[in-house]
């Protein structure tokens, strides 16, 4: 795909992952990128350089507001849809009604993109679509593979259900209308510009302020797939270039890391000796 000839829309474009995606698209030759973000969690400074260079056309707007999705997709060739109501584990567990709004957001934008004859739609999905009942035994060496998502569906809270429904909607549009799309499932993403309420940045921040006892949600045995943001955005662009039929793919690694091991590495690297205090009553998600 010749990105220099494509008009691209990135929703939620001032956020952590999206801003890295824009950097990567620019490096691949993109010269016309429209960004929409309500700045509820994104930061304009993440894309300010591209705005000033004229590559990014920035719109501060709410995609749930009437008419906004239709205006944003007008004249666009490729949509990367990363906008969502989201947060760390505590947020998605404690704000289910807020996360449920993603069902409407995704459906409205997909319909608008199809009606505007967008060439390709790439959706930021999540490991939360995987069945909870498969992930309850930490002693089991489980690798989540794409075909595990199927009946009986058992997504992780309303955030996961919304992501799953968007994936299924895109497959339906591909099957019924020939609408070209792909879904990319993120796991635990880390990297520069990461926000403070996500796991890795929160750990590092607590280490630098010398928190002692050092608090860990759960018992530390939860398994996570830590994935660098640069790998995520390269995967999204490859999906845009190579997948047309709404297929959902994992963007992650096969490296399994316990939360407690990540904590110990952060403490070691920052030179902190601290007592570790487990908080088993706090939200942890699937183990």
Residue ranges and their predicted role:
Residues 1-189:
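N-terminal Rossmann-like NAD(P)+-binding domain of SDR-like oxidoreductases, especially those catalyzing
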Residues 28, 61, 209-287:
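C-terminal substrate-binding subdomain of Rossmann-fold SDR/epimerase-dehydratase oxidoreductases
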Residues 64, 101-104, 157, 194, ...:
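Residue-level signal for the nucleotide or nucleotide-sugar donor/cofactor binding architecture
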Residues 67-70, 77, 197, 201, ...:
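Residues in well-ordered alpha-helical elements
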Residues 71-72, 112, 206, 235, ...:
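CheY-like receiver
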Residues 136-138, 196-206:
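A glycine/serine/threonine-rich, flexible loop-to-helix segment
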Residues 165, 169, 173, 203, ...:
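Hydrophobic alpha-helix immediately C-terminal to the catalytic Tyr-X-X-X-Lys motif of short-chain
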């Amino acid at each position: 795909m010749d990105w220099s000839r494509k008009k691209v829309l990135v929703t939620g474009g001032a956020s952590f992952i999206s801003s890295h995606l824009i950097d990567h698209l620019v490096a691949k030759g993109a010269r016309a990128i429209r960004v929409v973000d309500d700045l509820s969690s994104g930061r304009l400074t993440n894309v300010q350089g591209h705005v000033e260079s004229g590559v990014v056309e920035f719109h501060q707007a709410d995609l749930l507001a009437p008419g906004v999705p239709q205006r944003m997709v007008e004249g666009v060739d490729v949509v990367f849809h990363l906008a969502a109501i989201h947060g760390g584990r505590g947020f998605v567990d404690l704000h289910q009604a807020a996360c449920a709004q993603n069902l409407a957001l995704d459906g409205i934008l997909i319909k608008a993109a199809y009606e505007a004859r967008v060439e390709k739609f790439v959706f930021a999905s999540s490991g939360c679509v995987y069945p909870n009942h498969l992930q309850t035994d930490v002693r089991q060496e489980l690798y989540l593979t794409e075909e595990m998502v199927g009946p009986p569906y058992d997504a992780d809270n309303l955030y996961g259900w919304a992501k799953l429904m968007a994936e299924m909607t895109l497959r339906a549009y591909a099957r019924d209308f020939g609408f070209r799309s792909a879904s990319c499932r993120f796991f635990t993403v880390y990297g520069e510009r990461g926000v403070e309420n996500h796991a890795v940045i929160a750990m590092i921040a607590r280490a630098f302020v010398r928190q002692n006892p050092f608090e860990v949600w759960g018992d530390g045995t939860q398994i996570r797939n830590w994935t660098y943001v640069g790998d995520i955005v390269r995967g999204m662009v490859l999906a845009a270039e190579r997948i047309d039929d709404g297929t959902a793919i994992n963007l992650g690694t096969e490296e399994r890391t316990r939360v407690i091991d990540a904590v110990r590495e952060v403490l070691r690297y920052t030179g902190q000796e601290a007592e570790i205090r487990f908080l088993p009553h706090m939200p942890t998600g699937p183990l």
